[in-house]
Amino acid sequence: MEYISFRSLQHYLYCPHRWGLMEIDRAWAENFYVVKANALHERAHSGVSYSLRGRKTYTDVDLWNDELGIIGKTDCIEESKDGLCIVEYKPTKPKTELVRHDDAMQLFAQKLCADAIFETDCKVQIYYADVKRRFNVSFDSSFDSELTVILSEMRRYIAR
């Protein structure tokens, strides 16, 4: 089975054409927005762990789920007395919604992996750098079936 990364999943849902240019054709150049997002993620992908306000924070955490064939890194996982919480960093808050669907699906995939690895039910938050705020993200039952369909679609395109 072809493993799909969290990043690839998010890119596919954002724009399948752009995903194809990046992942299949390898014909994509980074622009200002990609560079800005990379700078935001620099600390999150440092691999450094630290403690702050009663929470232990682990950055650049490897996650995977062999059953689903998904793999990748989460920006950070925080451990507190309340349990684990995945935090994903994004440069800008969407104008019309709290969380874009492509970002929510990326976080859902990360949650499935973390829940399986750590045998828990972790919380999920998204942090928007432009407003310097975190927002809780929740998922309904439709995410499970949608993720399965999307991963199958992506694997069909990759296999061509």
Regions found by a protein language model. Give the residues of each.
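Metal-dependent nuclease catalytic cores that hydrolyze phosphodiester bonds in DNA/RNA
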Residues: M1-I86, P91-K95, M105
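Short, intrinsically disordered/low-complexity patches at protein termini
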Residues: R43-S46, A109-K111, A159-R160
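Metal-dependent nuclease catalytic regions and adjoining charged, substrate-binding loops involved
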Residues: D66-E67, L98, A116-R160
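Short, charged, amphipathic alpha-helix that recurs within catalytic cores of restriction-modification
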Residues: D102-A114
